[in-house]
Amino acid sequence: MSRYRGPRFKKIRRLGSLPGLTSKRPRSGSDLRNQSRSGKRSQYRIRLEEKQKLRFHYGLTERQLLRYVRIAGKAKGSTGQVLLQLLEMRLDNILFRLGMASTIPGARQLVNHRHILVNGRLVDIPSYRCKPRDIITTRDEHRSRALIQNSIDSSQKEELPKHLTLHSLQYQYKGLVNQIIDSKWVGLKINELLVVEYYSRQT
């Protein structure tokens, strides 16, 4: 299944706020109206919607998300917590959380178009897994700097998660990854256990 490129507001009206997909918010009460129309949701549908929330927020294909679930399942610790850490430490998501892009699709475009450096080296893979002490900057070109500045200026000034720091000097921005993200700083309201459960019942 390919990455979603359809109407974004349609998704947030059904699934709720998806800040990685769009800065728009569903109208107050729209979720309740949708639920009342459809009646009581089955357990399968609840699990499916949590999985879809995760997929659309982080901008993943079905195959990509399944791969992350499998990697998390083989790691030590809670599969759900490890899954969220893997997704949050992707380069495209780190750029979004730093405010250097207004959405995750926007961050992915910055990476694909070769505007982003990690530790001084060009990285054009949005799924690149960032590590503690990574330094994220832009290429020393006017266009690269201007794109980041536009995102910084237009972004909602939200508190940065504790695992990240953003420094600025004369329109040059430098993001620092201080540590692996703590689960309480994940940028999406999600029940990750339902996502793991969804996939465990598919096998």
Curated annotation (Swiss-Prot):
One of its GO terms (biological process) is ribosomal small subunit biogenesis. Signal peptide: none annotated. Belongs to the universal ribosomal protein uS4 family. GO terms for cellular component: chloroplast; small ribosomal subunit. SMART domains: Ribosomal_S4, S4. The keyword Iron-sulfur does not apply. It comes from the Eukaryota. Part of the 30S ribosomal subunit. Contacts protein S5. The interaction surface between S4 and S5 is involved in control of translational fidelity. This is Small ribosomal subunit protein uS4c. It is found in: Plastid, Chloroplast. It comes from Illicium oligandrum. The gene is rps4. Residues 15-43 are annotated as: Disordered. The keyword Chloroplast applies. Pfam families: Ribosomal_S4, S4. One of the primary rRNA binding proteins, it binds directly to 16S rRNA where it nucleates assembly of the body of the 30S subunit.
